[in-house]
């Protein structure tokens, strides 16, 4: 077992019940362009077209052969584009009767002997290939490529996260089948990373290996697991995939159709009853959270408070791979001389508030940043929350000034936005390190 000694478990109120309930009916779903880094679509449908579940809706000009399919049957009611015509979302009104595209199905014994090309082709044709992510760069891999290893995390340490075991227990066989399929994509191991007391049987066997991680967030981040087990570089790539996506892949190959089921936790201080709900892939957040929020001006975040996106307007749908929706109150108000208050109801990593004497206290965080952008001040906060074997202050400085050579030497290629989310949270200068990292990664990739 690998113990993570640095990090931060954010003491935010609104943890979900660790049991699954039926969610509200979903009337629309969407494929969000922002879920796919560097993707440039060639549209295969128009507004008003009727599509089947699993039907091709666009392909990627940048990565030849990658197909994106519809998560539901129905009518395409909107294709939203933003600045420079960047695709924001393709919105589909869900039909009452769902027609779907079918694919080949296999028995458990057949899965173990499937040809790699056949596995890749079915994943690509169904659109489930887009569930895979590369390290470095965090992109959908090119069809025909082979990773050094594949990582699956069944440990989620994000604030207010649902325990993956709750979902996997209901779909254990499909999860095992999904791991078998993933093992056909690589000659290396398929790593299943779990917590020390995960209430699940072992999945190890054949190419599938297991490792336990314990400690504070980001102990559950796949970037942490990759750093300790199979570090990447410009000439070495690994892939990762979420635990619910492994289940979906398993069902695709055993049932011959796309699974649109998803379990998403409704969490946060503004949720009336935080709990896990059954819903659909890409569900509308308005449908999902209907009648579930406290009164007030609320912000819905698709994902964790540390690394989700603001689900509103043309992107008011759940991300393809998200496992939670977090509700926060908009922090419009400003507090006069708040920095000299005792801080019984305020949280800080540093020992500056009275709340430090109240271990276990949960806070109703809002969206306020408690100040505007200012100079980056190294006060030791980054080192407190960064468990990886890198120099965070030096790396962050290199990222801010765009020194890609230094950033590469300091370990930037091992990171994605989620790996720097705690650095963003504790930063006295209010820097958003996720977008800064992404700009640097784009430059590094372009320069080779």
Curated annotation (Swiss-Prot):
E.C. numbers: 7.2.1.1
Protein name per its UniProtKB record: Na(+)-translocating NADH-quinone reductase subunit A
Family: Belongs to the NqrA family.
Reaction catalysed by this enzyme: a ubiquinone + n Na(+)(in) + NADH + H(+) = a ubiquinol + n Na(+)(out) + NAD(+)
InterPro entries: NqrA, NQRA_2nd, NqrA_C_domain, NQRA_N
Gene name linked to the record: nqrA
GO biological process: sodium ion transport
Assembly and binders: Composed of six subunits; NqrA, NqrB, NqrC, NqrD, NqrE and NqrF.
Function text: NQR complex catalyzes the reduction of ubiquinone-1 to ubiquinol by two successive reactions, coupled with the transport of Na(+) ions from the cytoplasm to the periplasm. NqrA to NqrE are probably involved in the second step, the conversion of ubisemiquinone to ubiquinol.
Key words of the record: Ion transport, NAD, Sodium, Sodium transport, Translocase, Transport, Ubiquinone
GO molecular function: oxidoreductase activity, acting on NAD(P)H, quinone or similar compound as acceptor
Alphabetized Pfam families for the sequence: NQRA_2nd, NQRA_N, NQRA_SLBB
């Amino acid at each position: 077992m690998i113990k993570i000694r640095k990090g931060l478990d954010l003491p935010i109120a609104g943890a979900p019940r660790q049991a699954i309930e039926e969610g509200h009916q979903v009337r629309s779903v969407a494929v969000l362009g922002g879920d796919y880094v560097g993707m440039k679509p060639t549209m295969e449908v128009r507004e008003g077209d009727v599509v089947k579940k699993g039907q091709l809706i666009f392909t990627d000009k940048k990565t030849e052969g990658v197909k994106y399919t519809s998560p539901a049957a129905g009518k395409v009611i909107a294709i939203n584009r933003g600045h420079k015509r960047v695709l924001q979302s393709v919105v589909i009104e869900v039909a009452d009767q769902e027609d779907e595209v079918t694919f080949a199905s296999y028995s458990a014994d057949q899965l173990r002997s499937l040809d790699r090309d056949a596995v890749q082709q079915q994943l690509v044709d169904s659109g489930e290939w887009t569930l895979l992510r590369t390290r470095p760069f965090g992109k959908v891999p090119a069809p025909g490529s082979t990773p050094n290893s594949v990582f699956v995390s069944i440990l989620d340490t994000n604030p207010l996260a649902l325990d993956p075991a709750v979902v996997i227990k209901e779909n254990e066989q499909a999860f095992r089948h999904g791991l078998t399929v993933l093992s056909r994509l690589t000659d290396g191991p398929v790593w299943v990373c779990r917590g020390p007391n995960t209430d699940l049987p072992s999945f190890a066997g054949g190419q599938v290996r297991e490792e336990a991680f314990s400690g504070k967030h980001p102990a559950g981040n796949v970037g942490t697991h990759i750093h300790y087990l199979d570090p990447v570089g410009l000439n070495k790539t690994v892939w990762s995939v979420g635990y619910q996506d492994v289940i979906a892949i398993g069902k695709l190959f055993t049932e011959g159709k796309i699974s649109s089921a998803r379990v998403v936790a409704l969490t946060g201080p503004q949720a009336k009853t935080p709990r896990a709900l059954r819903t659909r892939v890409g569900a509308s957040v308005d449908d999902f959270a209907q009648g579930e929020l406290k009164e007030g001006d609320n912000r819905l975040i698709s994902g964790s408070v540390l690394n989700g996106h603001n689900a509103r307007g043309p992107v008011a749908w759940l991300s393809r791979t998200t496992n939670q929706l977090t509700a926060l109150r908009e922090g419009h108000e400003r507090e006069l001389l708040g920095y000299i208050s005792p801080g019984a109801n305020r949280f800080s990593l540093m020992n500056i508030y009275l709340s430090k004497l109240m271990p276990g206290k949960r806070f109703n965080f809002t969206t306020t940043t408690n100040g505007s952008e200012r100079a980056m001040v190294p006060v030791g906060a980054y080192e407190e929350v960064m468990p990886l074997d890198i120099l965070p202050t030096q790396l962050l400085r290199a990222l801010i000034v765009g020194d890609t050579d230094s950033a590469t030497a300091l370990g930037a290629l091992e990171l994605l936005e989620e790996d720097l989310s705690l650095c963003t949270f504790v930063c006295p200068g209010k820097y958003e390190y996720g977008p800064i990292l992404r700009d640097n990664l784009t430059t590094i990739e372009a320069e080779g």
